[in-house]
Amino acid sequence: MFKIMLIEDDHTLFSEIKERLSQWSYDVFGVSNFEKVIEEFTSLKPDLVIIDIQLPKFDGFHWCRMIRQHSNVPIIFLSSRDHPTDMVMSMQLGADDFIQKPFHFDVLVAKIQAILRRVHNYTSEQTQLKTWCGATIDYESNTVSNHVGSIELSKNEFFILKRLIERKNKIVTRDDLIRSLWEDERFISDNTLTVNVNRLRKRLDELGLGAYIETKVGQGYMAKEDGNTHD
């Protein structure tokens, strides 16, 4: 069952949306503290987020920015505001759709279904295909598992590992990694990249895989299959 986080301060509308979506077997969760939306988001790990623009303390644009620093979860904006700049701003911040109030619930359900179908099918496709050095790489849970055990990586660590595995046995430059991270809205510096790669190796060492990530001095990194010791 998919979990939906509904960031809406209108209690009547929240109850209506929750009731309607529950009929379609969606679990809908609200926000108990509008100053701690990110904390609640991180704890819940929803499959999709619906955000109103006008909210207490900080507006929906603020929370969209914050969520995008942590996740690529699908986001739908709801708003009674009808100015084109609101829709443009939503899309620029990384929202997947914008629905103007008042709206028909069938439209909301259809958009949710379309987004989740697209995202779920895409991630499932990737999850089934990724193996490396006898380990299973799970794109949905950011985990790496083999006969030794299983570890969960941070978003950045997993992104770096994924990028290296996609080009295994080839050098991936530091600039390429940083650029890819920025394109995915994970803004890190050159020094931070080094820290993340070192952390990644340390975590992979728990599964006996740390040596499979090699440093190519002055060039970048390589995901190997032979396990030669890295620098």
From Swiss-Prot:
KW Cytoplasm (keyword) present? yes
Please give the chief subcellular localization of this protein. Answer: cytoplasm
Q: Where is the Response regulatory domain?
A: 3-116
Enumerate the UniProt keywords alphabetically. Cytoplasm, DNA-binding, Phosphoprotein, Transcription, Transcription regulation, Two-component regulatory system
Cite the post-translational modification comment: Phosphorylated by BceS.
Cellular component, GO annotation: cytosol; protein-DNA complex
Q: What protein name applies here?
A: Sensory transduction protein BceR
